Amino acid sequence: MSKVYDWLEERLEIQAIADDITSKYVPPHVNIFYCLGGITLTCFLVQVATGFAMTFYYRPTVTEAFASVKYIMTEANFGWLIRSVHRWSASMMVLMMILHVFRVYLTGGFKKPRELTWVTGVVLAVLTASFGVTGYSLPWDQIGYWAVKIVTGVPEAIPLIGSPLVELLRGSASVGQSTLTRFYSLHTFVLPLITAVFMLMHFLMIRKQGISGPL
């Protein structure tokens, strides 16, 4: 193993990278509330893992979605546990994100020179809420159906562009298969990809600028 490590070290300078990560200065005022962002990231990773596992069984059609979720909960090995963890971590992610935003605001972490870090954080907060909206519809039960119908109907009040926007969200004039397909694609591919990009930007800026000092 040492020869393998030496070979990698010679080419990648692993030790230098490890030293840079572990030797980063942490201000003395940092407390447990500064861990809320990291907990949010952990919840996101749990979401990715459990969500990926459920894609093996979930069927995004209006005729099979509910039955496939029922199969996950009652017949698939550990399916009930995986889906339950997915739901619990989703709620935890939203809660930790809200608390993280409050912590940053109350401690002035959004001030110069960290304005862009705050902006990317706000975008991540919107993306987190979007995960909740799109994921809520996927079981395609009564609650999910009517939630989607109400949420996608809200933009209709916007003058001129309201109706076209509603049709864009739903995929048609009414809520149906096109709507479920759109929400499934958003929830499992588009939103995770965008979230990963903004998280990378967010963490790189934190890494570069460091943790903000006390007020």
Curated annotation (Swiss-Prot):
Component of the cytochrome b6-f complex, which mediates electron transfer between photosystem II (PSII) and photosystem I (PSI), cyclic electron flow around PSI, and state transitions. It comes from the Eukaryota. Belongs to the cytochrome b family. PetB subfamily. GO terms for molecular function: electron transporter, transferring electrons within cytochrome b6/f complex of photosystem II activity; metal ion binding; oxidoreductase activity. This is Cytochrome b6. The gene is petB. Heme c binds at C35. GO terms for biological process: photosynthesis; respiratory electron transport chain. It is found in: Plastid thylakoid membrane. Binds 2 heme b groups non-covalently with two histidine residues as axial ligands. SUPFAM superfamilies: Transmembrane di-heme cytochromes (SSF81342). One of its GO terms (cellular component) is plastid thylakoid membrane. The keyword Membrane applies. It holds the Pfam family Cytochrome_B. The keyword Transferase does not apply. The 4 large subunits of the cytochrome b6-f complex are cytochrome b6, subunit IV (17 kDa polypeptide, PetD), cytochrome f and the Rieske protein, while the 4 small subunits are PetG, PetL, PetM and PetN. The complex functions as a dimer. It is a multi-pass membrane protein. The chain crosses the membrane at residues 32-52, 90-110, 116-136, 186-206. Keywords: Electron transport, Heme, Iron, Membrane, Metal-binding, Photosynthesis, Plastid, Thylakoid, Transmembrane, Transmembrane helix, Transport. Gene3D superfamilies: Cytochrome Bc1 Complex, Chain C (1.20.810.10). Heme b 1 binds at H100, H202. Its cofactor is heme b; heme c. Heme b 2 binds at H86, H187. Heme 1 (or BH or b566) is high-potential and absorbs at about 566 nm, and heme 2 (or BL or b562) is low-potential and absorbs at about 562 nm.
